[in-house]
From Swiss-Prot:
Its EC number is 2.5.1.-. GO terms for biological process: polyprenol biosynthetic process. InterPro entries: UPP_synth-like, UPP_synth-like_CS, UPP_synth-like_sf. Keywords: Magnesium, Metal-binding, Transferase. HAMAP family: ISPT. One of its GO terms (molecular function) is magnesium ion binding. The keyword Transferase applies. This is Isoprenyl transferase. Mg(2+) binds at residues 13, 199. The gene is uppS. The active site is at residues 13, 61. Catalyzes the condensation of isopentenyl diphosphate (IPP) with allylic pyrophosphates generating different type of terpenoids. Belongs to the UPP synthase family.
Length: 234
C-alpha cells in the first residue's frame, strides 16, 4: 500500500474553549474557526494533497443549545455562498458527506449547488462532514445492502468492498492521516471505517489557533513514521 499522504482528515475541535479563554461568546470562536478552515483548505490545495475531510457538524451536535445549532446552520449556509469564488478560483472540488436529509431544503440546495458547480475539478477535493457520524453512515450502508442485496458476495473481501462502495466516501481515497486539534484524544465517531490504517495525531492547539505551519510540522512527523498496513517491515 502507498504511504504517500493523499487524504487528510481533521476533527476541528476547540472553537468554544478558544472563545471562552477570550471572554467571548462561542459564536466568536466558530467564526474564527471558519477562517482557519479556509486557510488550511487553501494550503492543502496548494501542496498536492488529493483530499481534505473536515468534521464540521456531527450527528451528536444537534444536542447543543438550539441557539448555537441555529447559528451554525446560518454560518454554514453563509460560508458556502460567500466562499463559492474561493472554490472556483483555486480549482477545489467540494463534497459533503453525512445524512443531509437532516437539514433544511434551503441548506441542502446550497450544498448541492456548490457540489455541482465544482464537480469537474479533479486535483483536490475538500469534504465537509455534515450531520455525519460513522455509526449512522455504516447503518445506512448496511440498510442499503439489506434492501438491495448483491448476488456476487462469496467471501469477506467482497463483502468489505460492497460496504465501502455504499459509504458516503465511496469515491474518495482511504484516510492516511487523522488529526484532532484541541487536546482531546478520541475519534468521536468520525470516519471509523475509512481510518483503519490511518496515522493518528492529537495536538493541544485549539482549532482557531491552528495554522498551516502547524500542519506542516505534523505532516513532517507523518513522513517519519513507518506505515506497516498490518505487514512486517524490516
Amino acid at each position: 500500500m502507498d504511504s504517500t499522504l493523499k487524504h487528510l482528515a481533521i476533527i476541528m475541535d476547540g472553537n468554544g474553549r478558544w472563545a471562552k479563554l477570550k471572554n467571548k461568546a462561542r459564536a466568536y470562536g466558530h467564526k474564527k474557526g471558519v477562517k482557519t478552515l479556509k486557510d488550511i483548505t487553501i494550503w492543502c490545495a496548494n501542496h498536492k494533497l488529493e483530499c481534505l475531510t473536515l468534521y464540521a457538524f456531527s450527528t451528536e451536535n444537534w444536542k447543543r443549545p438550539k441557539s448555537e445549532v441555529d447559528f451554525l446552520m446560518k454560518m454554514l449556509k453563509k460560508y458556502l455562498k460567500d466562499e463559492r469564488s474561493t472554490y472556483l478560483d483555486n480549482n477545489i472540488r467540494f463534497r459533503a458527506i453525512g445524512d443531509l436529509e437532516g437539514f433544511s431544503k434551503e441548506l441542502r440546495d446550497t450544498i448541492l449547488r456548490l457540489e455541482n458547480d465544482t464537480r469537474y475539478f479533479k486535483d483536490f477535493t475538500q469534504v465537509l462532514a455534515l450531520n455525519y457520524g460513522s455509526k449512522n453512515e455504516l447503518s445506512r450502508a448496511f440498510k442499503s445492502l439489506l434492501e438491495n442485496p448483491p448476488n456476487h458476495i462469496n467471501n469477506i473481501e467482497s463483502l468489505e468492498n460492497e460496504i465501502s462502495h455504499r459509504l458516503d466516501t465511496h469515491d474518495l481515497p482511504e484516510v492516511d492521516l487523522l488529526l484532532r486539534t484541541g487536546g482531546e484524544m478520541r475519534l468521536s465517531n468520525f470516519l471509523l471505517w475509512q481510518s483503519s490504517y490511518a496515522e493518528l495525531f492529537f495536538t493541544p492547539i485549539l482549532w482557531p489557533d491552528f495554522t498551516p505551519k502547524d500542519l506542516e510540522n505534523i505532516i513532517s512527523d507523518f513522513y517519519k513514521r513507518v506505515r506497516k498496513f498490518g505487514e512486517l517491515k524490516c
